[in-house]
Structure formats: structure tokens, C-alpha cells
From Swiss-Prot:
Signal peptide: none annotated. This is Putative O-antigen transporter. Could be an O-antigen transporter. The lineage of its organism: Bacteria, Pseudomonadati, Pseudomonadota, Gammaproteobacteria, Enterobacterales. The keyword DNA repair does not apply. It comes from Shigella flexneri. It holds the Pfam family Polysacc_synt. CDD domains: MATE_Wzx_like (cd13128). It is found in: Cell inner membrane.
Length: 418
């Protein structure tokens, strides 16, 4: 299958969940109130940040399955080793969240929402971590095989549940713990769907741990772990800093436009997910470069109209989706984030290309170099300019990140061609 066909499959996988997420998030924003909704988006961010407990193995598995697609023996070792390790390590991550949940709640400076409800919600959230990690791993097997039709049926079902079920729970009980309970229920459905589609792989591979295979996975994935630790900090930590400096009641007015950007992110993510396994499986560098250029052009042509429409109608989108308060307080934030989003989308192509060449160390070191300056800028800008400062900081970082990745990829091309 071509990158374009696989990208279309990926977009299809996001279409139904997005249609469900639009009214669902709007209902959650109104049902939980600004502070409750803001804390809920932070809870979602924590689950995303729990991706560090896959130590980069899911990305490694995609690459290894793509490389060893016709090697049955190596394939089973990759699946059994990664599954065995991640079951144990994700449970360890859940245990850590359980221990530190009260400290996280205190850091957020919550005023208007009942503390006991939030503490319960964050303890319940720990259950999501192993479910999230294993679901990512089993989806990675299908992505490595480029079975994007199956991947996106699975993602469509799973993401629809994750988008809609928390809102159903909040309809019956407008509390944060009810929303998180709905999220757990959705994650259980999600992992059952994933397990069904890879049941033969799981059954054949069994539960065995091969140190040599793990070492190879970790050598590539180890640098991915560095990226996985740092990248979510740069993606989600703005919400934590806003909550700590300005109070949890202000987070929602930043989180709402950030959620719009997150939903728009399905477009570049669909292309990026198709690009990585395809590039990993290409042996001829000229073909590799041709596919990268085609992917970059595709990303540009698809995302540019989205950004233009978004900039023209940002206020209207926020009013319809979240309510008039969000239109008043958040439309400038959304406009700034949209500009950053465009560059962030383009950056996915050189990022995937560099990693497909086995150079995950380079992308990890870039993230390391960006972290401290970004957090310093973010803290200063939030103190000085509030929510808009957070949006400007994020956009500056992703623009510089995109330019740096493209420059490094171009340099690598000159080395490989010579």
C-alpha cells in the first residue's frame, strides 16, 4: 500500500471518534465546569505522559516488525519479549501514580472542585496506565505489518469509546471521578478490541523473554524513551504550569483550544503513522528520499487549508463547541496554537525519516536540548502574559523544532548520498 492510501485509512480511523469527541468534550466542559474540565484534561495528559513506561518499545516494535515481516522466528521473539516486559513495567508505573497522586493534586492548586473527588479520580487513573501501554504495543504490531485497515477499525472503536463513554458517566454523575471511571471502562473495551485483532500473534508468541531481543529493542527504544520522557513534558506541562501559577480554574481556557489542536492533530498523525513503517522497510536510499519528499508535500497541501480555515473561524468553533466563555477567553490562544500546529505537522516527516534510518538518538538529543530553554520560556511567558504566553511559548518551540529537524535531515541526506 502507498503512503497516501495508508494515510487515508488512518484518517478514516479517526473520523468517527472525532465526530463523537466534538459533542462529548463540549458536554464535559459544561457538565464539569471550567475548573473540573481543566483538571480532567490534565488527567488525560497524565495518561499520555504514562507513555514513558513503554521505554520506547512500541516505536521499536513497529520498526522491528516492519524489518522482520517475513521472519517468523524473529517476529515471535519481538512480540513475546516486548509484551512480557511491558506488562510488568506498566504496572510499576501505575503503582507510582497511585503513590504520588495526592502530591500531584496539591501541585495543581485546585479551589472550586471537591478535593476528595479529585484525589479519588487520580487514584483511579492509575488503572489506565497498563491498559494504555498494552493497547499501544498491540496496535504497534499491526502498524509494523502496515495493516492499516485493521488498525483503524480497532482505533475507531477504541477512540470512540474513549471520547464518548466519560461523557455518559458524567451525565449520570457530574464528578471528575465519574469521568475517570468512564475513561477506565473505555480503556478496558479498547484493550479487548486490540487483543482480539492480535490474538493469533499473542497465542503463537507466548510469554517468553529474550534478553538479546530486548537489548536490540531497547537500544533503539532507549533513545525513544528519552524522547518519550521529554516530549510529553513539552506537550502537556504547559497545563500544569498554568494551573500552578494561575490556578486550576484558568486551565480550561487554555486546555479547550489545546484540545482543538489535539483533534486537528489526527491529520498529521494519520500521515506520520503511515510514513514511519513504510520508510523503515525501504532499502534503497533514493526511493527513501522520494517517499520523504512526497510525504512532506502531502502534509503541506493537506494542513495549509485547515490552518487558514481555522484562523478565520476560531472564535465560532470555540463558541459552538465549548460555549461563549471560551470564545471570549480562548480565541487568541487558538490562533497562536494553530500557527505552531502547522510547523509541528510538517516536522513529523523529517522526524519519522530520521528515526526510520535508526537515528533515534538524534531526535532524543534534540528534545534534550530543547527542554530547559522551553520550560524557562514557558514559565516566564505564563508569569508575564498568562494563557497567551503559554500558547506563544509552545508555538515558538515547535517552529524551531521543525526547522532544526528539517536541517538535520537534509544534512543526513548529503552524508548518505555521498
Amino acid at each position: 500500500m502507498s503512503i497516501i492510501k495508508n494515510s487515508v485509512w488512518n484518517l478514516f480511523g479517526y473520523a468517527i471518534p472525532t465526530l463523537i469527541a466534538i459533542p462529548s468534550l463540549g458536554f464535559l466542559a459544561r457538565g464539569l465546569g471550567p475548573e473540573g474540565f481543566g483538571v480532567y484534561t490534565i488527567a488525560i495528559a497524565l495518561v499520555g505522559y504514562a507513555g514513558i513506561f513503554d521505554v520506547g518499545l512500541t516505536r521499536s516494535v513497529i520498526r522491528e516488525i516492519a524489518i522482520h515481516r517475513d521472519n517468523h522466528h524473529e517476529r515471535t521473539k519481538v512480540i513475546s519479549t516486548s509484551t512480557s516486559f511491558l506488562v510488568l513495567f506498566s504496572c510499576f508505573g501505575a503503582f507510582l501514580l497511585l503513590i504520588f497522586s495526592d502530591g500531584i493534586v496539591n501541585y495543581l492548586k485546585i479551589s472550586g472542585v471537591e478535593h476528595s473527588d479529585i484525589q479519588l479520580a487520580f487514584k483511579l487513573l492509575a488503572i489506565c496506565i497498563p491498559l494504555f501501554i498494552l493497547n499501544q504495543l498491540w496496535s504497534a504490531i499491526l502498524e509494523g505489518d502496515e495493516k492499516f485497515g485493521i488498525v483503524n477499525i480497532q482505533k475507531s472503536i477504541s477512540s470512540s469509546c474513549i471520547a464518548g463513554i466519560p461523557a455518559i458517566f458524567v451525565f449520570y454523575s457530574a464528578t471528575l471521578s465519574a469521568a475517570v471511571a468512564g475513561l477506565i471502562f473505555a480503556r478496558v473495551i479498547s484493550i479487548l478490541v486490540s487483543a482480539y485483532y492480535v490474538r493469533n500473534d499473542i497465542k503463537i508468541s507466548g510469554v517468553h523473554f529474550c534478553y538479546k531481543t530486548f537489548k536490540r529493542l531497547f537500544f533503539f527504544g532507549g533513545w525513544m524513551t528519552v524522547s518519550n520522557i521529554i516530549s510529553p513534558v513539552m506537550v502537556y506541562f504547559d497545563r500544569f504550569i498554568v494551573s500552578n501559577i494561575m490556578g486550576a480554574d484558568k486551565v480550561a481556557f487554555y486546555s479547550a483550544p489545546a484540545e482543538v489542536i489535539l483533534k486537528l492533530g489526527i491529520i498529521p498523525a494519520a500521515i506520520g503513522r503511515a510514513v514511519f513503517p513504510r520508510l523503515s522497510n525501504i532499502k534503497d536510499f533514493k526511493e527513501f528520499k522520494r517517499n520523504v519528499n512526497k510525504s512532506l508535500l502531502l502534509m503541506f497541501l493537506i494542513c495549509l487549508p485547515v490552518i487558514i480555515i481555522g484562523l478565520l473561524y476560531s472564535g465560532l468553533v470555540l463558541k459552538i463547541w465549548f460555549g461563549e466563555n471560551y470564545q471570549i477567553n480562548s480565541f487568541n490562544i487558538l490562533n497562536v496554537l494553530l500557527i505552531g500546529f502547522f510547523f509541528n505537522a510538517l516536522a513529523m516527516i523529517p522526524f519519522s525519516a530520521i528515526q526510520a534510518l535508526g537515528k533515534s538518538k538524534i531526535t532524543a538529543l534534540i528534545h534534550c536540548a530543547e527542554l530547559v530553554p522551553y520550560l524557562a520560556l514557558l514559565y516566564f511567558m505564563v508569569e508575564k502574559y498568562g494563557l497567551l504566553g503559554a500558547a506563544i511559548s509552545w508555538s515558538i518551540r515547535v517552529i524551531l523544532d521543525a526547522l532544526l529537524l528539517q536541517w538535520l535531515y537534509t544534512r543526513m541526506c548529503s552524508v548518505y548520498e555521498n
